[in-house]
């Protein structure tokens, strides 16, 4: 086969599937304090990042071209502020013919990017760059089938 195409899953049976993905964004201590105290100009970072995760999970086939559009039955974002940044975990579940790890990863990355967007004015240095802001450790922690 040349080019690109979706994997044929027509012969597969729908089964329960679950995935958990996680990631982290390093932030300045002053930024973390502003998040905790609710002083971020754009609003509630935790709530908006959580909603971004849910939206990204549901929109994964529009973001990643060769993923299958599958019914999403459960999305549980967990956004936790730590002293050195924000940790995100997203659990996704469905009953389908293919897994939901890409959906979980999409949720995590969208949440982390949303955090960055919401705090970028606090993270910029005097040159307008982000030397302390780093997204790391994006991974699938769990993938279950059946």
Swiss-Prot record:
Where does the secretion signal sit in this chain?
A: none
Instruction: Read off the Pfam families from this record.
Output: MoaC (PF01967)
GO molecular function terms here? cyclic pyranopterin monophosphate synthase activity
Pathway the protein acts in: Cofactor biosynthesis; molybdopterin biosynthesis
Active-site residues, as the UniProt record annotates them: 117
The record lists the catalysed reaction(s) as:
(8S)-3',8-cyclo-7,8-dihydroguanosine 5'-triphosphate = cyclic pyranopterin phosphate + diphosphate
Keyword list, A-Z: Lyase, Molybdenum cofactor biosynthesis
UniProt-annotated binding residues for substrate: 66-68, 102-103
What InterPro entries does this protein's entry cite?
A: Mo_CF_biosynth-C_arc (IPR023047), MoaC (IPR023045), MoaC_sf (IPR036522), Mopterin_CF_biosynth-C_dom (IPR002820)
Cite the EC number: 4.6.1.17
What's its top-level EC category? lyase
The UniProt entry's GO biological process terms, in alphabetical order, are: Mo-molybdopterin cofactor biosynthetic process
Q: What does this protein do?
A: Catalyzes the conversion of (8S)-3',8-cyclo-7,8-dihydroguanosine 5'-triphosphate to cyclic pyranopterin monophosphate (cPMP).
Q: Which family does it belong to?
A: Belongs to the MoaC family.
- Assembly with partners or alone: Homohexamer; trimer of dimers.
Q: Which HAMAP family match?
A: MoaC_A
Protein name per Swiss-Prot or TrEMBL: Probable cyclic pyranopterin monophosphate synthase
């Amino acid at each position: 086969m040349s080019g690109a195409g979706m994997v044929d899953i027509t012969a597969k049976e729908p089964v329960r599937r679950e995935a958990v993905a996680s990631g982290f964004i390093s932030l300045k201590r002053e930024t973390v304090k502003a998040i905790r105290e609710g002083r971020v100009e754009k609003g509630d970072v935790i709530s908006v990042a959580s909603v971004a995760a849910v939206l990204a999970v549901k929109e994964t086939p529009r973001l990643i071209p060769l993923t299958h559009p599958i019914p999403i039955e459960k999305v549980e974002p967990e956004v936790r502020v730590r002293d050195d940044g924000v940790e995100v975990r997203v659990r996704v579940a469905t009953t389908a013919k293919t897994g939901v790890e890409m959906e979980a990863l999409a949720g995590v990355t969208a949440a982390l990017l949303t955090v960055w967007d919401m705090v970028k004015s606090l993270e910029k240095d005097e040159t307008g760059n982000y030397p302390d802001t780093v997204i790391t450790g994006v991974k699938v922690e769990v993938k279950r089938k059946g």
